[in-house]
Structure formats: structure tokens, C-alpha cells
Amino acid sequence: DDLASRVIAPVLYAYESIPSTLSKDQITAILQSAVKDQTPKGLRDYAVLQLLAVYGLRAGEIAHLKLSDVDWHAETLSIHHSKTGAHTLLPLMDQAGDALFQYLRHGRPKAAAVRDVFVRMRAPYEPLSSTGMYSAVRRRIEAAGVKPVGKRGPHLFRHARAVSMLRASIPRKVIGDVLGHRSTEATIPYLKLATEDLRSVALDVPGHEVRL
């Protein structure tokens, strides 16, 4: 028997499915649509979208974000990766930081007693669940008229961030650290999406400045 085929076939099968994702233009359209809504809920949803677009975080990681995780003086964001249990300290990028600031100052209910960053807009102002976040993101995608292939939830932004970093030739180890992957193997499914030629883009990652 051919040993190689017996060993490789199961590995290839595991990565056969190509993740759904969003293009750069689609993400821009979603953000531009969402930012027009300056209601408290709109400010909240826009901050969530910025965290998704900038960092590629999981919905659960954003849902469990605490007020103490945002260090405005050090300009950092502390993320507890729900799937792996790891912690990552990320730079507070301008877009995400500005959106968070506007939401916390003008959108988040003053009466909210919990320490979670994102809360529901109606009393008793409980933490926004992962399910609630999924629904909010899906509404914003639909409101922007964006029709991605496959599921229309927060993970689309995570896939897009992974692909953009792969296309920018950022090492898989760095990508894994940013996304909170348990191993570099977790980035392999995105390689199928990262094969197109793109125009020049800049991406800032701690300790790295990479251009296509």
C-alpha cells in the first residue's frame, strides 16, 4: 500500500472546507453603514464591529470583555481567549479605541451595574450575550446590504482578519498569537482564502510592520 496517501488524505480532508469571509470593501460598507446610527445601540454595535474588524476576535471574547480590560493610559486591550484559555495583550488601535470611547461615554447605560463593557440597552442592563452579539452583527450586515456567502455572523470578520494577515505575509505564529489560536495549524484553513493578489495594504501588529 502507498503509505503517503494513507497518511496525508485525512489531513487534507480536515481542511477541505473553506471558511466564509468578507472582502475589504464589504467590511468598509458595513462599518460605514453602522457608524451612521448614533443611538446608544448604534454606538454599541459599531464598537463591536470595530473590535471584530480590527482584531478578529471571537464573539465570546468581546462579550466577556470587562471595563478593566481596557487600559486607556497604556493604550492596550487585554483579551481572554475563550476557546484556548490564553491571554493576549493587544495595542488599542485608533479605530477600535475611538469607537469604544464613544460607546462608553455616550452609549453605555449609566445605570448598568455590571463590569462588562457591552450590555443590553434595556433594564436591568445585563451583559450582552454571544447570541445577542451574533444577532446585532447579523442585523448590521443586512442593513449594509452586504450578502456574504454562508453564515452571516461575527466569525466572518475573524476569517477576514486571518486572511488579510496571511496575505500580508505575517508569520503564522504571530497570526496565531493575535487570534488566540492554540497552534499554528489553526490558520491552515485560511490559506485557501489567501491566494489572491491584492493591492498594497499596511497592517500594524506588535513588533511588525508589513506591507504587501
Which role fits each region the language model picked out?
Residues D1-L212:
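Conserved catalytic core of the tyrosine transesterase superfamily
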